[in-house]
């Protein structure tokens, strides 16, 4: 049909002759049924976390090949599932399939492997956290966002510096990289409550729609994408519905629709009213 589909990892290895020249021992593990990333869900995240955990003591680092559409969701989820990490878990992929002449897959994968194997002078991993590597940049996994569906600069971390930039050599920003307590064991948390909704505020938003969403009996969390520094329309019904949900034990987190900047609900009156209604700031 000409449509892009997931492929078996063996096909990738057949096209990646450069892998043999790396001074790194690489083992591979392939899921039996490759999955388009648009079909990822929390059960798949938990499975990935368990795969890492089951092999954690056998390897110095992990590279996960993942479709770009939901890669940022997976990297963020894994960053909370894999607690007390002392080894890199790096997600990467490509915009063009590896068989195409201008593919970005080779550089992304080869550099990800090198970063996953990188150690400091004491033999500790340079980047012991969940990350995304793409187009020369290593990003914190729970700060990365897919920003481009066409170019090779697919991901960006708007409110947090790159952990490493890959040029002729690697430039690590050590003071921005998590430093783990190496005495603590890996703590894997795979239980997630999926009764969460994300909705964006917009001028003219209707009470009947918001009321219907917030009235869901199993609702446990709301991510509200608000205006600017965390503001919302000062409609009394919005504040009442949010307050009622908060009183029922629903966690409501306020994030901005802006790509950069921070939620400061105490800055303007509309934001202060959200705070009074029990809404929690998502900061940056």
Language model regions located:
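Short glycine/serine/threonine-rich phosphate/pyrophosphate-binding segments
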Residues: 1, 69-75, 105-109, 231-234
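ATP/NTP phosphate-donor binding region
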Residues: 1-54
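Accessory alpha-helical/coil subdomains and C-terminal extensions
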Residues: 5-20, 140-229, 234-235
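Structural motif
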Residues: 60-61, 221
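Short beta-strand segments
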Residues: 64-66, 90-93, 131-135, 200, ...
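Short Gly/Thr/Asp-enriched flexible loops that form oxyanion-binding sites at enzyme active sites
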Residues: 64-87, 234-241
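Internal gly/pro-rich beta-alpha loop/helix module
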Residues: 91-168
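C-terminal non-catalytic interaction/assembly regions of soluble proteins
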Residues: 226-284
């Amino acid at each position: 049909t000409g449509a892009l589909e997931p492929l078996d990892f063996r096909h990738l290895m057949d096209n990646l002759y450069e892998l043999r020249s790396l001074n790194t021992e690489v083992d591979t593990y392939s899921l039996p049924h490759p999955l388009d990333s648009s079909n990822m869900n929390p059960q798949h995240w938990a499975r990935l976390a368990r795969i890492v955990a089951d092999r954690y003591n056998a390897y110095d680092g992990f590279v996960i090949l993942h479709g770009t559409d939901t890669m940022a969701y997976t990297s963020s989820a894994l960053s909370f599932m894999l607690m007390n990490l002392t080894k890199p878990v790096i997600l990467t992929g490509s915009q063009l399939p590896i068989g195409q002449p201008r593919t970005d897959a080779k550089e992304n994968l080869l550099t990800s492997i090198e970063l996953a194997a990188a150690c400091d002078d004491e033999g500790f991993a340079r980047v012991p956290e969940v990350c995304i590597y793409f187009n020369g940049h290593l990003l914190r996994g729970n700060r990365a966002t897919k920003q481009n569906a066409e170019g090779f600069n697919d991901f960006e971390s708007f409110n947090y510096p790159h952990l490493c930039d890959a040029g002729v050599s690697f430039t690590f920003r050590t003071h921005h990289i998590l430093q783990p307590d190496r005495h603590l064991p890996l703590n894997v948390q795979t239980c997630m409550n999926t009764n969460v909704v994300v909705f964006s505020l917009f001028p003219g938003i209707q009470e009947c729609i918001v009321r219907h969403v917030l009235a869901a009996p199993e609702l446990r969390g709301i991510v509200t994408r608000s205006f600017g520094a965390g503001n919302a329309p000062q409609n009394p019904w919005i504040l009442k519905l949010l307050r009622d949900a908060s009183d029922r034990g629903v966690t409501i987190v306020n994030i901005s629709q802006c790509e950069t900047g921070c939620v400061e609900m105490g800055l303007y009156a509309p934001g202060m009213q959200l705070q009074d209604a029990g809404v929690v700031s998502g900061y940056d």
